[in-house]
């Protein structure tokens, strides 16, 4: 009797089968397209950002090839290429989710910002593979739904039914989608049963170490929004240098973020929330207060970074739909809600660069 295959072999076989099913599904088998299951993409919760991972990164933002990530937005003119010889896009990437995890925020933002290109940055290999497979499955499902809707619309177009077809177009599309799509389960949550704005063509994910290569991907003032959701708190003092919020990294975020752009943060650790506020100049700790009284170069440098951001008021946050998605759509946000924990939100607006003195 042949023993059952080991867990790793099961995971590899499942991933291969899922990828093939997504790429080879025909126009008539919408129900066969399913989202990947997380249990086959397990990985450790953390990755050391200071290790020398085998990462591919562009020489500069002008060398980055985005064409494979957003095929629906590739410039139709083949002569429009970047410095690396890759096809250009019709628009630039302008929304970034740093540490995108399993892609909950990307999926939630896709229909909310259908005209904006959104990218998730993740350092863990298996997690990135899950997000990529998930996005491909959602895109394939949307393509099948569009084809089914177009077929149903063409069949119903007669002179006597034209007005009724116009009035009931959306209802027919929803009914066709519901009939073709399976009911969501625990492993296939958020499976869309109707067409969504953008059809998930505006989201993608890349493997990258943000702490090392963030400026290699994004040019000055390119981004309109940056999301940092439930980052690793690194509780030990000797590990604070690995936190994704710091004076140095905040300066890089300010470089890529355009004036008026927003940097969103959310955490369930109150101490880390105050760390964020201190590093954006909203709060002052004991060390910062002593530095302010001194004339050390370090104090001046910290003040310079803090002058680039201002905190967004609570009144504005209540009207911002992205804040709601950040709280409710992310996997960590759902886990905190299940455990009835607290969520600490802070959003900062990029100020206009000060003018050079005359």
From Swiss-Prot:
EC code(s) of this entry: 2.1.1.33
GO cellular component terms listed in the entry, alphabetical order: nucleus; tRNA methyltransferase complex
One MF annotation (Gene Ontology) recorded for this entry: tRNA binding
Biased composition (Low complexity): 151-186
Database matches in InterPro entries: SAM-dependent_MTases_sf, Trm8_euk, tRNA_(Gua-N-7)_MeTrfase_Trmb
Subcellular location: Nucleus
Record keywords: Methyltransferase, Nucleus, RNA-binding, S-adenosyl-L-methionine, Transferase, tRNA processing, tRNA-binding
Main function: Catalyzes the formation of N(7)-methylguanine at position 46 (m7G46) in tRNA.
Protein name per UniProt: tRNA (guanine-N(7)-)-methyltransferase
Chain's gene name: trm8
